[in-house]
């Protein structure tokens, strides 16, 4: 890992020289790229300095502990060593994660689709809980969220919820949320106190950049229908034909949007989702053809694959793909997802590039 850090520090010096060149401002695209790289490398530098300083303090405490005789000071030093070892482990993992080579698509916005699966009303309620969890996580990362479509259930929660999320490294941290999320808990309507199991399916679709030439949709291939939007239970919320349904005839992909009162806005949102789904279908097709890469993925990313279990009675969350079990489900549901998403990103990196690169 030290070799990687030294390479990054050397590159940071080069980037700083390039950014300080007044001529760089004549090329906004290059300046933007260098600025992002500078921010990433600076974060690595700061993390490395924190790790080195913490290791030094730990080393000093251990040295003092080896010669100290006073029981009170010994106890204090032992506590310091324990805290120091935990800090070194945490900072090492943080630095290791920062050293993961960035994917060109890491900063792509994503469209996240959550749907109630088995479990009826309880599944719909858990969709609502997951929506809240992802909104809190996004807020903690400084990301922006936008509701694209929402279909409420009769008892609260959502039958389906589609949102766009944008910001730095959105795709990197959210791409492995795709799959089936299983929940085990006692529903509020359960009078016997029995634990019920229900499920929510999640799809994460990277949103194509505006200049992405891979996604081309011919207007001739689209069928666009308009109709009156309606709320939960079929109650009309708009007397005009503002809702939009777009069908991509070649692929059969259908997208409906009725959240906005403007037909134009609903069409724009539906087109965003349509493009993301078509792009995702192409990516999935290529991934299936590249069998070597598939073996290194954290699961298939298929929404039918059970990836995680949320057990509320035990306050336990388990990610089945990497065998990670945590007993702080309450914190996870409050948006503290980094402990899971970071572990997944690190696992994939080790699988693809080998542990020796970051060890």
From Swiss-Prot:
Methylated by PrmC. Methylation increases the termination efficiency of RF1. Signal peptide: none annotated. One of its GO terms (cellular component) is cytoplasm. Residues 287-312 are annotated as: Disordered. One of its GO terms (molecular function) is translation release factor activity, codon specific. Its main location: cytoplasm. InterPro entries: PCRF, Pep_chain_release_fac_I, Pep_chain_release_fac_I_sf, Prokaryotic/Mito_RF, RF-1. The modification N5-methylglutamine is found at residue 235. It comes from the Bacteria. It holds the Pfam family RF-1. The keyword Ion transport does not apply. Peptide chain release factor 1 directs the termination of translation in response to the peptide chain termination codons UAG and UAA. Belongs to the prokaryotic/mitochondrial release factor family. This is Peptide chain release factor 1. The lineage of its organism: Bacteria, Pseudomonadati, Chlamydiota, Chlamydiia, Chlamydiales.
